[in-house]
Structures are given as C-alpha cells and as structure tokens.
C-alpha cells in the first residue's frame, strides 16, 4: 500500500493551474497528529510512503523524522525542486523515486510556474545527479494549452537528467482553455502519435525511453492493475496534515473522499469507487477509469468526461497496435523487460494522463 502523506498545505510557488498553497482550513500547514500513528500502520502492513504538499520540502524536519521512525519499504517525494539544494546528499539516498515538477521547455515551464523556475528545477536535477543519486528521477509535467507533448517530452529526455517523464493533463478541474477540442485535435493527439513512433523507433535500436504513460499502459495491458491506475482508495491512500485518511490527495474538501482518520481503529480503508460506464469499457484493463477525482466530480459534465475518454482510448489503441512488435523486441533480447514495464510498484505515477 502506498500512503501519500501531506507534509504541509503550504507551497512556495503559485502556479497558474493550481493557485499555490491549500487553504489552511482544509489542509493545515502543520502536522496535527503523532508520527506514532504512521508507525502503527507500518506494523500492520508493508507500506511505501510518498511525501506530498503543498511543497513537501517546506516541512523537511517532519520528512526526516518519518524516515527515521517509520519502517516503510520505500520513500518517494513529489517536489517542485526549489529546495533540493538545501538538503544534504545523504538525505536523498533515502528515496527510491524523486518526482520534480517541470512542464517541458523553459518558456512553457516559466509561463505556468513562474519566471526562472525552469532553470532552478534543472539545477536541482543536476544536483541530484552530481551527488551520486542512483534512484529514479521523474520529470512530472502538467500539460496545458501552451504545451507541445512531443517537443516537451523529448526535450526533457534529451537533458539526460530524468529517468522517466510523466505528464498529467490540466483538464476537468480547470476552465482555462481557449479551445480544448481544437488543441486535442491539432496538437495533443498528433503529438502523441509522433511520440509513440519515436518511442518505438528507439526501442528498435535498443533504447527504452522512459515515457511513463506509454510504459504504464503497456504494463497494464500485459499484467492488469488496479482501478483507478493511480491506486486511489485501492492500493493508495492519502493522509492529510490533520490526520484524515483520504481516497485521493487532491480531494481534500470532498466528503466522498474522507474514508477515516488516523484516530479511528480501522484496519482496512480500501474501497473501489470506479463503476459504470468505465467498468463496461473495452479499455478498462488499461485505463482503469483514468482518474478517481475526475470520475467523481465531472466538472466538465458528461460531454467533457466523454471527450477525455475518447482521446484516452486513442492513446491506448496506439500502444495496443504496437504491442506485438514491442514484445518481439523483448523476446529477441533487443530490449530488457525490466526497463520496459514501468512502474514496477505504485510510485505515485498516475499512468493515464
């Protein structure tokens, strides 16, 4: 089980698509529970812990204390990267995966996250590499209208700083689109098609590029997986700073997401929210309902929900069409299975954009 732990609701950025810090009344900026509660969970089951915010590194002392006291199998952190240089290299050795928020090329990242942010995140990635960090460094993109999926993903891979690139679409919870349908038709889907070909061509030459959504879809295609693919409420739970146990880390004010609290003596919080129409869909094995929050809230209504389903299916169909070719490359020893099927455990990569 992965536990996504809010270390604080505070953030040191105010990105265009999320607005910065969480309101204190929903996600307090200080921890309101004892770390002993986390130790009790770790005694009952094998757990991984992902530190989340706000900006999680703003509460670095809490992170250090959890690492010291809670016997988790693996530690993960999702960070904007601005405070990476404030921590000793030995601190980073505790983490199996580090996700750095960066949206692609400099102009796009700075447009959404603030002037100079691209350079600071790239600097953070360099610091990790030069310190000898050997874990998984993931470029975590938020993709919106100024982005170009092919350009931005290939750019980040070309830096040789990131093992994997993952993106999430800024859809459903945002109305800040001039013409979403046109963007999907003329930018996103042509870019996805081009990126799939680029991925396949590199594999034919013996290189597996770390394009996380493609790898995750292929892995689910072969091995299956939980629904939704991020694991929300099935093999991932979130713990807010006030001790509430949530189905999803961004559903901090939705009543449906409140499963329990750390004070309750409840042993199993798992539940499955994803039902029809997703469970009847022919891509459910790969898609798993895509996103629990989007499934439950449907801010764009049924039409918007269905439009996102359609281009998600297109992405899955593209990977399906290449499945046999990819597996043949594995069987011939051209590429290695352990490089291809990613992630090997729930490391907070949502898989479906």
Predicted features, each with a name:
Residues 6-14, 55, 233, 278, ...:
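Cysteine-centered iron-sulfur cluster-binding motifs in ferredoxin-type domains/subunits
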Residues 22, 53, 102, 169, ...:
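Residues that line or immediately flank small-molecule/substrate-binding pockets and catalytic motifs
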Residues 250-353:
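Flexible mid-to-C-terminal extensions adjoining Fe-S/redox cofactors in radical SAM and related proteins
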Residues 36-40, 44-50, 59-171, 181:
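Radical SAM/AdoMet-radical enzyme domain recognition
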Residues 1-33:
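Canonical Radical SAM [4Fe-4S] cluster-binding loop centered on the CxxxCxxC motif
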Residues 27-33, 115-122, 126, 130-245, ...:
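Radical SAM enzyme [4Fe-4S]-AdoMet core and its adjacent flexible, acidic
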Residues 13, 107, 246, 289:
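Glycine-centered loop/turn positions within well-structured domains
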Residues 21-25, 105-108, 172-175:
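A short, flexible beta-alpha/helix-coil linker loop
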């Amino acid at each position: 089980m992965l536990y996504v732990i809010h270390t604080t609701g505070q953030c040191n950025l105010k990105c265009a698509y999320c607005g910065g810090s969480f309101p204190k009344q929903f996600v307090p900026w200080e921890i309101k529970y004892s770390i002993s509660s986390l130790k009790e969970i770790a005694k009952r089951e094998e757990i991984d812990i992902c530190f989340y915010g706000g900006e999680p590194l703003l509460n670095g002392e809490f992170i250090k204390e959890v690492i010291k006291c809670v016997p988790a199998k693996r530690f993960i952190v999702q960070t904007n990267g601005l405070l990476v240089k404030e921590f000793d290299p030995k601190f980073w050795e505790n983490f199996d995966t580090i996700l750095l928020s960066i949206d692609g090329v400099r102009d796009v990242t700075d447009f959404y996250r603030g002037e100079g942010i691209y350079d600071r995140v790239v600097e953070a990635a360099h610091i990790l590499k030069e310190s000898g960090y050997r874990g998984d460094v993931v470029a975590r993109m938020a993709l919106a209208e100024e982005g170009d999926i092919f350009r931005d993903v290939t750019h980040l891979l070309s830096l040789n700083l990131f093992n994997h690139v993952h993106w999430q679409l800024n859809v459903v919870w945002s109305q800040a689109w001039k013409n979403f349908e046109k963007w999907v038709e003329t930018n996103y889907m042509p870019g996805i098609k081009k990126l799939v070909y680029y991925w396949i061509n590199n594999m034919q030459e013996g290189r597996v590029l770390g394009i996380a959504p493609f790898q995750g879809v292929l892995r689910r295609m072969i091995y299956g997986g939980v629904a939704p693919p991020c694991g929300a409420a099935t093999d991932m739970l979130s713990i807010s700073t006030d001790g509430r146990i949530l189905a999803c880390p961004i559903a901090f004010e939705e009543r449906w997401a409140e499963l329990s609290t750390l004070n309750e003596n409840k042993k199993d919080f798992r539940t499955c929210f994803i039902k029809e129409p997703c469970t009847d869909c022919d891509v459910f094995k790969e898609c798993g309902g895509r996103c629990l929050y989007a499934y439950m809230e449907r801010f764009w209504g049924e039409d918007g929900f269905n439009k996102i389903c359609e281009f998600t299916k297109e992405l899955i169909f593209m990977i399906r069409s290449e499945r046999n070719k990819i597996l043949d490359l594995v069987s011939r020893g051209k590429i290695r299975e352990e490089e291809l099927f990613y992630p090997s455990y729930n490391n907070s990569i949502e898989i479906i954009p």
